[in-house]
Structures are given as C-alpha cells and as structure tokens.
Amino acid sequence: MPRQIIKLVTLDLDDTLWPNKKGIIESEKALWRFVNLKFPEIERKINEEKITAIKVNLVENNPLIKFDLTRFRKEVIKEILLHLGAQENEAIYYSNEAFSEFFKIRNKVKLFPGAKNILERLNRDTNLISLSNGNADLGIIGIAKFFKATISSQDVSSNKPAPPHFLKALKIGGCKPEESLHIGDCPINDIGGARNCNFHTIWFNCEKRKWDEIVPYEYQAKSWKDAVSYTHLRAHETRED
C-alpha cells in the first residue's frame, strides 16, 4: 500500500477476526436441541419446507426483518411453535430461550492468531469500526473496547456489499474514502463493497482461496501478521485527539 495516512480502518467480523462456520453450525444445533427438548412433536410436524415458508412469509410481511438476524431467528421459532399449537406467550418465551442457547455458542469465538494485537494497534492509531452483516456481540466476545463503533445490517437496513455500512463508517469517522481501509474475507461483500465506495482494501484470505472475481484485489493477507505489514499506519499522525 502506498505510504499515506490511513485514518479509518473498518473490519469485517465473521471469518475475518475469527473462524465462523463451525461456530454457526454448533449454534444452530444448540437452538434446535432446545426446541426439540421442549416440543418433541416438532420432528414429525415441521419439515424444512414449512420452515422455509415461514421465513418467506415473515420477510414478505416485513422486508426489513431480514436485516435484524436476532429478531428474525426469534420470529421463525415463534411461528413454528404457534404452528405446533403453543399459546402466544408460550411461543414468545420459548423462542427467546431457544435464541439464548444459539447466542451463547455463537459468541464463543476464538480470534485468529495475531488478531487481538492488531486490534490494539488499530484502536491506538486509527478510528476502528466493525462492519458486519451478522449479529455477533463484541461486548460478550470481549473486544468491544477496541472499536469506536460497530455497524450491523440492522443499523443501516442493508447488507454489504451495498454502500450504507461503508458510508455510515465514513460519517462516524469523519474521514474521506481515500483515508480509509477495509479488511474482510468476502470478495464480494467486503472487497467489492468497499472498493465501490473508494476504500483501500485488504482481502483477508487465511484459507488460501483462489480469487475468482474479474477485478483483482488490491492487497491480500493470509494471516494477521500479513495484514499488519500492509497497513503502514503512521502512529501519532492518523488520528487527532
């Protein structure tokens, strides 16, 4: 990256700061174990087709709900329980409890090696903001203190790669796109979205995947050690106190 002042760094979360796929699978298992324990009849009365229909109906009735993953999951479970004959208050209670089981596992993440060190450095030297389409809780994970702000899809009623995440970060950071850097694992949601807003970009590729997009990436980091070497941040020049 050219030697220049970077004042704003935005970070994706899932599969950028920590591996996510296994955690989501285990979270889903925990949720459905709880539901099956409380409502064992679900296995013979509810199938994937019914669950899909419930999801489609929820989004048709409230298109914005798809950006609030916490509420969306709770509403899906609630509708399933109502279909099984539960009373409204019972369905609400157990959907909240089921989601709690999901969320406990969802936030038990292990940061990639070197990630915490770079968070400390970026927090010291820049405006650091997280941009996520998901619903991880940085407070529970224990890294919220490193971020000036967190921006989720719920906050902007949009998913990356659309511009709202990136534009809101620029507004919060009070920075220009050319002073901004986004780091993320997804070629489309992260790199494509950030590039369309004229951010500098680092493709975080710890899985050593092949780049299949037409437009080449700007920089690639296969570890957080690589990412540090690419940022070239100038301490004491990057943020005015």
Feature-to-residue mapping (PLM):
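N-terminal helical cap/lid subdomain that shapes the substrate entry/recognition surface
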Residues: 3-113
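Glycine-rich phosphate-binding loop signature in dinucleotide/nucleotide-binding domains
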Residues: 3-4, 124, 173-176
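Catalytic-core regions built around general acid/base machinery
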Residues: 114-125
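Conserved small/polar residues in nucleotide/adenosyl-binding loops
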Residues: 231-240
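Acidic, Mg2+-coordinating phosphoryl-transfer loop and its flanking beta/alpha structural elements
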Residues: 183-219
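Substrate-recognition "cap/lid" segment bordering the active-site pocket of phosphatases
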Residues: 108, 129-181, 187-189, 211-213
